[in-house]
C-alpha cells in the first residue's frame, strides 16, 4: 500500500486532527497517534513506526491545554451556543487550530488558520469551515 500522506506539515496536522477526534471518542493517546499516522503506511514487521514529533507535539499540546482551549473557545461563541453544542469535528479543529495559533510561535497565525480551514473543508462542510475560520480569526485579531 502506498501512503497518500507525504509527512508535510499539512499532512501531520490532518493526522493530529484524526488523533484528537479519536481521543474524543475514547481512544488512548499513543494508540490513536500511531493509528492516525500509520494506518496507510507500509512498514515491515521488524521496523517500528515512529510518529513525527510535530504530530506528537500538536496532539500532546492540545490534550495538555484542553481546558484552557475550551474556555477560550466558549468565550467566543455567540449567545445561546455552548461548546457541548458543537460537533466533535468542529471542537477538534478549533482546539487544534487555537493551540497552534497560541503556542507555536514558529507557525504564522494565518498559516495555522489556513491549514485548519483546509482540513475542515475535507472533514466537514463549507458552513463548518466558515464557522472555524470566523472563530479562529477572532483570536488572531484580538491577539494582535
Curated annotation (Swiss-Prot):
InterPro entries found in the cross-reference section: NusB-like_sf, NusB_fam, NusB_RsmB_TIM44
Keyword Coiled coil: no
Keywords: RNA-binding, Transcription, Transcription antitermination, Transcription regulation
GO biological process: DNA-templated transcription termination; transcription antitermination
Keyword RNA-binding (UniProt): yes
Signal peptide range in chain numbering: none
GO cellular component: cytosol
Family listed: Belongs to the NusB family.
Protein name (database record): Transcription antitermination protein NusB
Upper lineage: Bacteria, Bacillati, Bacillota, Bacilli, Lactobacillales
